[in-house]
């Protein structure tokens, strides 16, 4: 299945009150996953394309029709153009006030970390998939995604695995500690050394590793750190990355979504 879980969906898994959105335009479901009948899988490393069809009992196959559609090069392309000014749901001062409030909660010990977001709005004309293609070119991260759900689209580029469950093992790769790439190897090495010794970046990384261990331990045993504060180089930045893994309890009887529910 493919889809998403929003932050507000925490209300279904934990006893945490969540305020409903006051934005009438924000009517996307909080959780949406789809089992697609047809998949087209691209393997860029092998220059291969695989067509997958989920075929029910007694259903005819349409894989040949999909293959013909894939080979049809007669398609229309559309440009993308921003229209008007960029706006936000929060003013600069409102956002700064939220930051000050978040810092106060951290100092009181109410929370370990708060991730404050701010929505920006930009009207446009044309095909937003063109914008996604530009993002993919500028920031080629391990997790690139574009979902067209009809009434809304979601796309982005992320280096981070929230949780991976494979062959009886669940893993989380905490990423915290970031600095820029310079384009010069020696300068990048110096920036990496500075990153590894930066007290603030290291404190944040240790906190996320501890959170990952705690989250996995809620539903796994043999939770441990596989590697710790490994510098990883991306197109524009250098990240510090660790890996925490564990074995889900009664894995043969446990579905993946039950492990994810605890994360």
Tell where the protein language model's regions lie, with residue ranges:
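Extended alpha-helical targeting/anchoring segments
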Residues: 1-255
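Single conserved hydrophobic/aromatic residue that forms the stacking wall/gate
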Residues: 253-256, 260-263
